[in-house]
C-alpha cells in the first residue's frame, strides 16, 4: 500500500500520477471521461487527432446539491524527460452538479487540445468535491500550474476521482512535404 491506502498496483500509482500530480486519495465518486466513441481508461493511449474536441464527462455523486471541480493537466510538458512546464493546464471546469456532466458546470479555463511533441505524455483528469458553489479565478497562464496548490487555495482537499490516458505525437505529422 502507498500512503493514503492506495495499492501499489493501482494504475494511478503505477503511472506515477500519484506523486507527480497529487497525493494518495480515496476514490469516492464515479468519473467517466470519453472522446467520440472511446472511454478513457487509466493508461490507455489516445491519438492527438482523437482528442481535438473536449471530451464528454459524467460525474457521479450523491445528489445535484453537491458540486465538483474538474482539472485536466499534462505533468509531462514539454517532454517527459524534461517536464519544466509541469503541470500544463488543459481544462478547468467548476460548479459541476453531481449526477451530471461538465456542460452543467462553469468553464473557467477553456479546453485546449493536447499536442505533445516529444515522448509519451500523461493527460490527467482530476475531480474534486467543492464545499459549495464558489468563484474560481483563471490562472494567468497554463504552464507550471500546480494541482496541489490550486486544491489548497480553493480548499478542495484531495481528489475524489481521477483517470488518465497517454498521448504522443502522431507519426507522419509535422514533416516536410515535397
Swiss-Prot record:
GO terms for biological process: regulation of photoperiodism, flowering. Disulfide bonds: none annotated. Induction: Follows a circadian rhythm expression with a maximum transient peak four hours before dawn in long-day (LD) conditions, but barely expressed in short-day (SD) conditions. Targeted for mRNA cleavage by Pooideae-specific microRNAs miR5200a and miR5200b in leaves in short days, but not in long days. Expressed in leaves but not in shoot apex. Pfam families: PBP (PF01161). SUPFAM superfamilies: PEBP-like. It comes from the Eukaryota. Coiled coil: none annotated. InterPro entries: PEBP (IPR008914), PEBP-like_sf (IPR036610), PEBP_euk (IPR035810), Phosphatidylethanolamine-bd_CS (IPR001858). Belongs to the phosphatidylethanolamine-binding protein family. Involved in the regulation of vernalization and of flowering time. This is Protein FLOWERING LOCUS T 1. It comes from Brachypodium distachyon. The gene is FTL1.
